[in-house]
Amino acid sequence: SILPSPSSRAALNYPPAPVHGKGRQSKRAVLAGAISTGTLFLVLLVVLVCVYMKRTRTGANERARDGAREDSSNTYVSPEQFTLPLLRAATGNFAPENKLGEGGFGQVFKGKMPNGQAIAVKRLSQSSSQGFHELKNELVLAAKLRHRNLVQILGVCLEEKEKLIVYEYLPNRSLDTLLFDSERRRRGLDWRKRHTIICGIARGLLYLHEESQLRVIHRDLKPSNVLLDEHMNPKISDFGLARAFRPDQSRDVTKRAAGTLGYMSPEYAYCGHVSVKSDMYSFGVIVLEVVTGRRNSSPGQDNANSLLSEVWEKWRAGTAAEMADASLGDQYPRAQMLSCMHIGLLCVQKKPELRPDASEVVLMLSSQSRSRRTPSRPAFYAGSTGGAVTASRARRSENVSKNGVTMSELEPR
């Protein structure tokens, strides 16, 4: 009597008893489906991300390769563009009285901008087929090189048939002018200024060879390509012949040498082997010229005594101080002068591997240490005991430079 009747049980509307076997399987199926769907979604998402990243990397690599190709093809940040009428007005239409000098690629004129700024304008020769290549090479390097001992390029002008490069103006002209033009000028070049010039050129070479983003070989370093500011600080100029190397590259071979005899190393002049040691040879010649006040002669030049040979003979005899520029009188520190002469002789040794690097030279110039190696016989030695350079051999390179003017037409680039 306590249990409800079947009719009353139906009225209570109890839920039907679960069917345990089939219900459990259904829930598992739903759960498995959800998991598999989520897993598939995650897999697809990972695949899509991987594809996207791969494409991004590929694009970046292609852009990097394109950038490398552009860099190797000498692209550069475009310099300021000057108009031809502006530069004509600044230089008095390239008036002869504004002419500062002349080189293998053209003439240099002094100019004055409307704001009063003094400038130097190099007017490249229109007859030279190499003019545009030299201009492009110089602009490419100017966009990537910045140092207090390098001349700064301000801009360029390519209008009509003119190819003009605008530089900062340096009032003390070139080292060549101060050393060799007149006795009066040399008297104003005391030892302190000479030592400052030697040290500044060395620091400029250190930057070009080891510290800049490019490894640059100048290839035509000489006194006329060293300009001096109002404080007599030297600035290396004229990078028309310069060659940029990869950071891991130390030397190259050219078909024809291009530069100025008397400043070209023997391995470069005769074999076309160019390296940082070629520049160091040129630097050594300049150092000896600054110390002695005398110009080095070209090898094979008739009736000419090589400055390098004379300094070497005096050095071996212990009388090197006799080679000091007479215009200095006795107003110079003898030890420092002999130290510079020693460094110059180390740099002009015949074998490139014996010449010091720019970093070594900078260290030697700033150090009072005398523990330096003994220089061997210089290249192009023409002394009584050394094998003289024959005139016929030297003449094979005479077409490289004439009367100290750089020639580059013989070397295709």
Question: Model-found features: residue ranges?
Answer:
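Pre-DFG segment of protein kinase catalytic domains
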Residues: K235-D238
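Membrane-proximal cytoplasmic juxtamembrane segment of single-pass receptors
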Residues: P16-V166, P171-R203, Q249-K255, L261, ...
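Activation segment
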Residues: L241-R243, C271-V276
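Intrinsically disordered, low-complexity cytosolic regulatory tails
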Residues: N61-R63, D302, Y332-I343, Q349-R413
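Conserved catalytic-loop aspartate of Hanks-type protein kinases
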Residues: D279
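Protein kinase catalytic-loop region centered on the HRD/HxD motif
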Residues: R203-V216
